[in-house]
Amino acid sequence: MSDSKNLNQERQKALDSAISQIEKAFGRGAIMKLKQGAIEKIDSISTGSIALDTALGIGGFPKGRIVEIFGPESSGKTTLALHVIAESQKKGGNCAFIDAEHALDIMYARKLGVNTGDLIVSQPDTGEQALHIVEYLVCSGAIDVIVVDSVAALTPRAEIEGDMGDQHMGLQARLLSHALRKLTSIVSKANCVLIFINQIRMKIGVVYGNPETTTGGNALKFYSSVRLDIRKVSAIKDKDVIIGNQTKVKVVKNKVAPPFKQVDFDIMYNEGISKVGEIIDMGVKLNIIEKAGSYYSYNSVRLGQGKENAKSYLKANCDTAHEIEQKIRSILASDNEVSCFNAEVNDNLHEVEETVF
Protein backbone atom coordinates (compact mmCIF):
# COMPACT_ATOMS: atom_id res chain seq x y z
CA MET A 1 0.00 0.00 0.00
CA SER A 2 2.83 2.38 0.97
CA ASP A 3 4.73 1.49 -2.22
CA SER A 4 1.76 2.44 -4.42
CA LYS A 5 1.31 5.66 -2.43
CA ASN A 6 4.98 6.58 -2.91
CA LEU A 7 4.68 5.76 -6.62
CA ASN A 8 1.66 8.08 -6.95
CA GLN A 9 3.54 10.87 -5.17
CA GLU A 10 6.51 10.47 -7.51
CA ARG A 11 4.21 10.53 -10.55
CA GLN A 12 2.54 13.68 -9.23
CA LYS A 13 5.93 15.37 -8.68
CA ALA A 14 6.97 14.45 -12.22
CA LEU A 15 3.69 15.86 -13.59
CA ASP A 16 4.06 19.10 -11.58
CA SER A 17 7.62 19.45 -12.86
CA ALA A 18 6.46 18.99 -16.47
CA ILE A 19 3.68 21.58 -16.02
CA SER A 20 6.19 24.01 -14.50
CA GLN A 21 8.54 23.59 -17.47
CA ILE A 22 5.67 24.11 -19.94
CA GLU A 23 4.62 27.33 -18.17
CA LYS A 24 8.21 28.62 -18.24
CA ALA A 25 8.49 27.86 -21.96
CA PHE A 26 5.05 29.02 -23.16
CA GLY A 27 3.77 31.31 -20.39
CA ARG A 28 1.36 31.00 -17.49
CA GLY A 29 -2.01 29.58 -18.54
CA ALA A 30 -0.61 27.51 -21.40
CA ILE A 31 -1.62 24.40 -19.45
CA MET A 32 -3.82 23.88 -16.40
CA LYS A 33 -6.27 21.53 -14.72
CA LEU A 34 -9.95 22.05 -15.49
CA LYS A 35 -10.85 22.41 -11.81
CA GLN A 36 -8.67 25.53 -11.63
CA GLY A 37 -11.51 27.48 -13.24
CA ALA A 38 -10.34 27.54 -16.85
CA ILE A 39 -13.74 26.39 -18.13
CA GLU A 40 -16.63 28.79 -17.67
CA LYS A 41 -20.07 29.18 -19.18
CA ILE A 42 -19.79 29.73 -22.93
CA ASP A 43 -20.90 33.20 -24.00
CA SER A 44 -23.23 33.39 -26.98
CA ILE A 45 -24.77 35.81 -29.46
CA SER A 46 -28.47 35.45 -30.23
CA THR A 47 -29.51 34.35 -33.71
CA GLY A 48 -32.63 36.52 -33.62
CA SER A 49 -34.78 33.40 -33.36
CA ILE A 50 -36.12 32.25 -29.98
CA ALA A 51 -36.58 28.69 -31.22
CA LEU A 52 -33.10 28.43 -32.75
CA ASP A 53 -31.45 29.96 -29.66
CA THR A 54 -33.15 27.25 -27.61
CA ALA A 55 -32.14 24.47 -30.02
CA LEU A 56 -28.50 25.57 -29.86
CA GLY A 57 -28.59 24.98 -26.10
CA ILE A 58 -26.64 28.07 -24.99
CA GLY A 59 -28.88 30.87 -26.28
CA GLY A 60 -27.25 31.45 -29.66
CA PHE A 61 -23.96 31.03 -31.52
CA PRO A 62 -21.00 30.34 -29.20
CA LYS A 63 -18.35 33.06 -28.97
CA GLY A 64 -14.81 32.08 -29.84
CA ARG A 65 -16.00 29.41 -32.27
CA ILE A 66 -16.47 28.83 -35.99
CA VAL A 67 -20.01 28.36 -37.33
CA GLU A 68 -21.13 27.06 -40.73
CA ILE A 69 -24.55 27.81 -42.22
CA PHE A 70 -25.33 25.83 -45.37
CA GLY A 71 -28.35 25.07 -47.52
CA PRO A 72 -29.88 25.40 -51.01
CA GLU A 73 -30.24 28.70 -52.82
CA SER A 74 -32.65 31.28 -51.35
CA SER A 75 -33.13 29.25 -48.17
CA GLY A 76 -32.34 32.09 -45.74
CA LYS A 77 -28.60 31.61 -45.05
CA THR A 78 -27.61 35.26 -45.43
CA THR A 79 -30.80 36.40 -43.69
CA LEU A 80 -29.92 34.35 -40.61
CA ALA A 81 -26.33 35.68 -40.62
CA LEU A 82 -27.57 39.28 -40.88
CA HIS A 83 -29.90 38.70 -37.92
CA VAL A 84 -26.89 37.57 -35.86
CA ILE A 85 -25.09 40.78 -36.84
CA ALA A 86 -28.14 42.85 -35.86
CA GLU A 87 -28.38 41.14 -32.46
CA SER A 88 -24.67 41.70 -31.81
CA GLN A 89 -24.91 45.37 -32.77
CA LYS A 90 -27.81 45.85 -30.34
CA LYS A 91 -25.37 44.95 -27.55
CA GLY A 92 -22.68 47.29 -28.85
CA GLY A 93 -20.71 44.71 -30.83
CA ASN A 94 -18.54 45.42 -33.86
CA CYS A 95 -19.37 43.29 -36.91
CA ALA A 96 -17.83 42.64 -40.32
CA PHE A 97 -19.29 41.19 -43.51
CA ILE A 98 -16.87 39.69 -46.05
CA ASP A 99 -18.96 39.83 -49.23
CA ALA A 100 -17.07 37.40 -51.45
CA GLU A 101 -20.18 36.99 -53.64
CA HIS A 102 -20.42 40.78 -54.16
CA ALA A 103 -24.16 40.50 -53.59
CA LEU A 104 -24.89 42.16 -50.22
CA ASP A 105 -28.21 44.04 -50.30
CA ILE A 106 -27.68 47.01 -47.98
CA MET A 107 -31.37 48.03 -47.99
CA TYR A 108 -32.46 44.51 -47.04
CA ALA A 109 -29.85 44.36 -44.26
CA ARG A 110 -31.19 47.65 -42.91
CA LYS A 111 -34.73 46.24 -42.84
CA LEU A 112 -33.49 43.31 -40.74
CA GLY A 113 -32.21 45.71 -38.10
CA VAL A 114 -28.54 45.90 -39.14
CA ASN A 115 -26.85 49.24 -38.46
CA THR A 116 -25.26 49.46 -41.91
CA GLY A 117 -23.42 52.67 -41.01
CA ASP A 118 -21.27 50.81 -38.46
CA LEU A 119 -21.03 47.54 -40.40
CA ILE A 120 -17.55 46.80 -41.77
CA VAL A 121 -17.87 45.49 -45.34
CA SER A 122 -15.22 44.05 -47.64
CA GLN A 123 -15.61 42.77 -51.20
CA PRO A 124 -12.35 40.89 -51.81
CA ASP A 125 -11.05 39.94 -55.25
CA THR A 126 -9.59 36.55 -54.28
CA GLY A 127 -10.05 33.88 -51.64
CA GLU A 128 -6.57 34.56 -50.24
CA GLN A 129 -7.39 38.26 -49.84
CA ALA A 130 -10.68 37.46 -48.08
CA LEU A 131 -9.06 35.10 -45.57
CA HIS A 132 -6.18 37.53 -44.91
CA ILE A 133 -8.76 40.23 -44.14
CA VAL A 134 -10.54 37.84 -41.76
CA GLU A 135 -7.22 37.10 -40.04
CA TYR A 136 -6.40 40.80 -39.56
CA LEU A 137 -9.87 41.54 -38.19
CA VAL A 138 -9.79 38.61 -35.76
CA CYS A 139 -6.28 39.48 -34.55
CA SER A 140 -7.45 43.03 -33.76
CA GLY A 141 -9.55 41.59 -30.93
CA ALA A 142 -12.17 44.28 -31.54
CA ILE A 143 -14.62 42.31 -33.71
CA ASP A 144 -17.54 40.32 -32.27
CA VAL A 145 -19.01 38.77 -35.44
CA ILE A 146 -17.46 38.11 -38.85
CA VAL A 147 -19.58 36.69 -41.69
CA VAL A 148 -17.96 35.22 -44.81
CA ASP A 149 -20.49 35.00 -47.66
CA SER A 150 -19.74 32.55 -49.08
CA VAL A 151 -17.19 29.71 -49.05
CA ALA A 152 -18.02 28.84 -52.67
CA ALA A 153 -17.03 32.38 -53.74
CA LEU A 154 -13.57 32.19 -52.12
CA THR A 155 -11.83 31.74 -55.46
CA PRO A 156 -8.07 31.01 -55.29
CA ARG A 157 -5.81 33.57 -56.98
CA ALA A 158 -4.38 30.96 -59.37
CA GLU A 159 -7.88 30.22 -60.66
CA ILE A 160 -8.68 33.89 -61.25
CA GLU A 161 -5.39 34.58 -63.03
CA GLY A 162 -5.65 31.41 -65.16
CA ASP A 163 -7.76 30.77 -68.24
CA MET A 164 -11.44 29.90 -68.06
CA GLY A 165 -10.96 26.22 -68.97
CA ASP A 166 -7.97 25.49 -66.70
CA GLN A 167 -8.33 22.67 -64.18
CA HIS A 168 -7.37 23.47 -60.57
CA MET A 169 -7.94 20.35 -58.51
CA GLY A 170 -8.42 20.89 -54.78
CA LEU A 171 -7.05 24.46 -54.72
CA GLN A 172 -9.95 25.88 -52.75
CA ALA A 173 -9.99 22.97 -50.28
CA ARG A 174 -6.25 23.39 -49.60
CA LEU A 175 -6.66 27.16 -49.21
CA LEU A 176 -9.47 26.76 -46.69
CA SER A 177 -7.72 23.97 -44.79
CA HIS A 178 -4.59 26.10 -44.37
CA ALA A 179 -6.59 29.17 -43.32
CA LEU A 180 -8.70 27.32 -40.74
CA ARG A 181 -5.59 25.87 -39.09
CA LYS A 182 -4.46 29.45 -38.43
CA LEU A 183 -7.85 30.95 -37.64
CA THR A 184 -9.17 28.43 -35.09
CA SER A 185 -6.88 29.42 -32.22
CA ILE A 186 -6.99 33.19 -32.80
CA VAL A 187 -10.81 33.15 -33.09
CA SER A 188 -10.93 31.46 -29.68
CA LYS A 189 -8.55 34.00 -28.12
CA ALA A 190 -10.40 36.95 -29.69
CA ASN A 191 -13.75 35.53 -28.45
CA CYS A 192 -15.51 36.37 -31.70
CA VAL A 193 -17.97 34.38 -33.81
CA LEU A 194 -16.73 33.50 -37.29
CA ILE A 195 -19.64 32.50 -39.55
CA PHE A 196 -19.06 30.82 -42.90
CA ILE A 197 -22.03 30.66 -45.29
CA ASN A 198 -21.76 27.69 -47.62
CA GLN A 199 -23.55 26.32 -50.66
CA ILE A 200 -24.62 22.80 -51.58
CA ARG A 201 -23.31 20.71 -54.46
CA MET A 202 -24.23 17.23 -55.71
CA LYS A 203 -21.80 14.32 -55.69
CA ILE A 204 -21.61 12.53 -59.04
CA GLY A 205 -22.48 8.83 -59.20
CA VAL A 206 -24.02 8.48 -55.73
CA VAL A 207 -26.71 5.79 -55.85
CA TYR A 208 -27.28 5.17 -52.14
CA GLY A 209 -27.24 7.79 -49.42
CA ASN A 210 -27.36 11.56 -49.59
CA PRO A 211 -25.65 12.95 -52.73
CA GLU A 212 -25.45 16.47 -51.27
CA THR A 213 -22.17 17.94 -50.06
CA THR A 214 -20.82 21.40 -49.22
CA THR A 215 -18.06 23.24 -51.09
CA GLY A 216 -14.52 23.80 -49.86
CA GLY A 217 -13.60 20.26 -48.85
CA ASN A 218 -13.94 18.67 -45.42
CA ALA A 219 -11.84 21.06 -43.31
CA LEU A 220 -14.70 23.40 -42.44
CA LYS A 221 -16.85 20.47 -41.30
CA PHE A 222 -14.19 19.50 -38.76
CA TYR A 223 -13.26 22.99 -37.54
CA SER A 224 -16.86 24.20 -37.10
CA SER A 225 -18.30 23.98 -33.59
CA VAL A 226 -21.83 24.49 -34.95
CA ARG A 227 -23.21 23.51 -38.37
CA LEU A 228 -26.73 24.51 -39.42
CA ASP A 229 -28.67 23.03 -42.33
CA ILE A 230 -31.30 25.57 -43.38
CA ARG A 231 -34.08 24.69 -45.85
CA LYS A 232 -37.17 26.33 -47.32
CA VAL A 233 -40.21 24.16 -46.52
CA SER A 234 -43.17 25.95 -48.08
CA ALA A 235 -44.39 29.34 -49.23
CA ILE A 236 -46.48 31.63 -47.01
CA LYS A 237 -49.30 33.25 -48.96
CA ASP A 238 -51.62 36.17 -48.38
CA LYS A 239 -54.45 35.16 -50.70
CA ASP A 240 -52.54 34.49 -53.95
CA VAL A 241 -49.45 36.57 -53.14
CA ILE A 242 -46.36 34.85 -51.68
CA ILE A 243 -45.17 36.98 -48.74
CA GLY A 244 -42.58 34.67 -47.17
CA ASN A 245 -41.31 31.17 -46.59
CA GLN A 246 -41.67 28.65 -43.82
CA THR A 247 -38.11 27.62 -42.98
CA LYS A 248 -36.64 24.58 -41.26
CA VAL A 249 -33.24 24.62 -39.53
CA LYS A 250 -31.48 21.49 -38.31
CA VAL A 251 -28.46 21.62 -36.00
CA VAL A 252 -26.39 18.90 -37.69
CA LYS A 253 -23.32 19.51 -35.50
CA ASN A 254 -22.98 21.10 -32.07
CA LYS A 255 -19.88 20.88 -29.89
CA VAL A 256 -21.34 22.96 -27.04
CA ALA A 257 -24.75 21.25 -26.55
CA PRO A 258 -26.68 18.18 -27.78
CA PRO A 259 -26.99 18.31 -31.61
CA PHE A 260 -29.64 17.19 -34.13
CA LYS A 261 -32.39 19.48 -32.85
CA GLN A 262 -34.73 20.94 -35.45
CA VAL A 263 -36.78 24.14 -35.46
CA ASP A 264 -39.20 25.88 -37.81
CA PHE A 265 -39.80 29.59 -38.24
CA ASP A 266 -41.16 32.02 -40.82
CA ILE A 267 -38.95 34.25 -42.96
CA MET A 268 -41.03 37.10 -44.33
CA TYR A 269 -39.97 39.14 -47.36
CA ASN A 270 -38.54 42.57 -46.42
CA GLU A 271 -38.82 41.62 -42.74
CA GLY A 272 -36.64 38.58 -42.07
CA ILE A 273 -37.35 36.09 -39.31
CA SER A 274 -40.90 36.70 -38.07
CA LYS A 275 -40.64 37.26 -34.32
CA VAL A 276 -44.41 37.32 -33.77
CA GLY A 277 -44.72 34.12 -35.80
CA GLU A 278 -42.25 32.45 -33.46
CA ILE A 279 -44.08 33.80 -30.42
CA ILE A 280 -47.29 32.18 -31.69
CA ASP A 281 -45.63 28.83 -32.52
CA MET A 282 -43.68 28.65 -29.24
CA GLY A 283 -46.69 29.90 -27.27
CA VAL A 284 -48.87 27.10 -28.63
CA LYS A 285 -46.20 24.46 -27.90
CA LEU A 286 -45.79 25.69 -24.32
CA ASN A 287 -49.59 26.00 -23.78
CA ILE A 288 -49.35 29.76 -23.28
CA ILE A 289 -51.49 30.44 -26.36
CA GLU A 290 -54.62 28.37 -26.88
CA LYS A 291 -55.38 27.02 -30.33
CA ALA A 292 -58.85 25.71 -31.12
CA GLY A 293 -59.16 24.73 -34.75
CA SER A 294 -57.83 27.71 -36.68
CA TYR A 295 -58.50 30.20 -33.85
CA TYR A 296 -55.76 31.51 -31.55
CA SER A 297 -56.47 33.04 -28.15
CA TYR A 298 -54.52 34.28 -25.13
CA ASN A 299 -56.05 34.79 -21.67
CA SER A 300 -59.54 34.40 -23.18
CA VAL A 301 -58.77 37.14 -25.72
CA ARG A 302 -59.10 35.99 -29.32
CA LEU A 303 -55.98 36.83 -31.35
CA GLY A 304 -57.50 35.92 -34.69
CA GLN A 305 -58.51 33.17 -37.07
CA GLY A 306 -55.46 31.73 -38.80
CA LYS A 307 -51.83 32.37 -38.00
CA GLU A 308 -51.46 35.45 -40.23
CA ASN A 309 -54.39 37.21 -38.51
CA ALA A 310 -52.94 36.31 -35.10
CA LYS A 311 -49.59 37.76 -36.20
CA SER A 312 -51.32 40.97 -37.30
CA TYR A 313 -52.99 41.25 -33.88
CA LEU A 314 -49.69 40.85 -32.01
CA LYS A 315 -47.98 43.40 -34.29
CA ALA A 316 -50.73 45.88 -33.43
CA ASN A 317 -50.63 45.00 -29.70
CA CYS A 318 -46.93 45.05 -28.79
CA ASP A 319 -47.58 44.84 -25.03
CA THR A 320 -49.41 41.52 -25.42
CA ALA A 321 -46.66 40.16 -27.68
CA HIS A 322 -43.99 41.24 -25.18
CA GLU A 323 -45.89 39.64 -22.30
CA ILE A 324 -46.18 36.31 -24.14
CA GLU A 325 -42.50 36.46 -25.15
CA GLN A 326 -41.42 37.00 -21.53
CA LYS A 327 -43.45 33.98 -20.42
CA ILE A 328 -41.86 31.86 -23.17
CA ARG A 329 -38.34 32.95 -22.20
CA SER A 330 -39.09 32.35 -18.51
CA ILE A 331 -40.20 28.76 -19.17
CA LEU A 332 -37.23 28.08 -21.46
CA ALA A 333 -34.80 29.56 -18.92
CA SER A 334 -36.19 27.36 -16.14
CA ASP A 335 -35.86 24.30 -18.39
CA ASN A 336 -32.20 25.16 -19.02
CA GLU A 337 -31.59 25.57 -15.28
CA VAL A 338 -33.07 22.12 -14.64
CA SER A 339 -30.87 20.53 -17.32
CA CYS A 340 -27.78 22.30 -15.91
CA PHE A 341 -28.72 21.13 -12.39
CA ASN A 342 -29.10 17.55 -13.62
CA ALA A 343 -25.69 17.76 -15.32
CA GLU A 344 -24.08 19.02 -12.09
CA VAL A 345 -25.73 16.22 -10.09
CA ASN A 346 -24.42 13.62 -12.57
CA ASP A 347 -20.90 15.11 -12.32
CA ASN A 348 -21.04 14.96 -8.52
CA LEU A 349 -22.23 11.34 -8.63
CA HIS A 350 -19.31 10.43 -10.91
CA GLU A 351 -16.89 12.08 -8.48
CA VAL A 352 -18.38 10.14 -5.55
CA GLU A 353 -18.16 6.87 -7.50
CA GLU A 354 -14.51 7.53 -8.35
CA THR A 355 -13.75 8.30 -4.69
CA VAL A 356 -15.52 5.20 -3.36
CA PHE A 357 -14.37 2.71 -5.98
Swiss-Prot record:
The answer, when asked if DNA damage is one of the entry's keywords, is: yes
Highest rank taxon of the organism: Bacteria
Please name the InterPro entries in this protein's record: AAA+_ATPase, DNA_recomb/repair_RecA, DNA_recomb/repair_RecA_CS, P-loop_NTPase, RecA-like_C, RecA-like_N, RecA_ATP-bd, RecA_C_sf
Q: Where in the cell is it found?
A: Cytoplasm
Keywords (alphabetical) are: ATP-binding, Cytoplasm, DNA damage, DNA recombination, DNA repair, DNA-binding, Nucleotide-binding, SOS response
Q: Which CDD domains match?
A: RecA
Query: In which residues is ATP bound?
Result: G71, P72, E73, S74, S75, G76, K77, T78
Name the protein family: Belongs to the RecA family.
Q: What is this protein called?
A: Protein RecA
Encoding gene (name): recA
